[in-house]
């Protein structure tokens, strides 16, 4: 399991691109429902030493992640031409009650998380980016352990 910091050390350009894309606003979190089907949710990722997500304790996405921690997180794309590019990561999410991690996430957040929000730490197992340029695209990928 790879933290965001470890990912950034191994693939600094890819991590910097991903951080920039996630900071532009809403991203989309895919989880696995209890019946095995996919579920997609808008979220605001937080990047500090770890990749974090806060959410309401009653959120369906939180229930999904507590039952099956697999996730994929994809940045919003600005337009049908690909805008600033695409970035996504996949890995495992773990619910944490650690006060030090919560403090870290609150400090890194672009908003003030509500006290009742639960916190997930997301590992990075795979990352991929596409930048669309005149005449083609620039793609990169990274996988933990490669």
Describe each PLM feature range.
Residues 2-35:
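Short, conserved active-site entrance elements at the starts or edges of catalytic domains
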Residues 21, 65, 105-107:
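A generic structural signal for nonpolar/aromatic side chains embedded in well-ordered alpha-helices
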Residues 22, 38-40, 82, 115:
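Short, solvent-exposed coil/turn segments
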Residues 24-57, 65, 71-77:
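Short beta-strand segments
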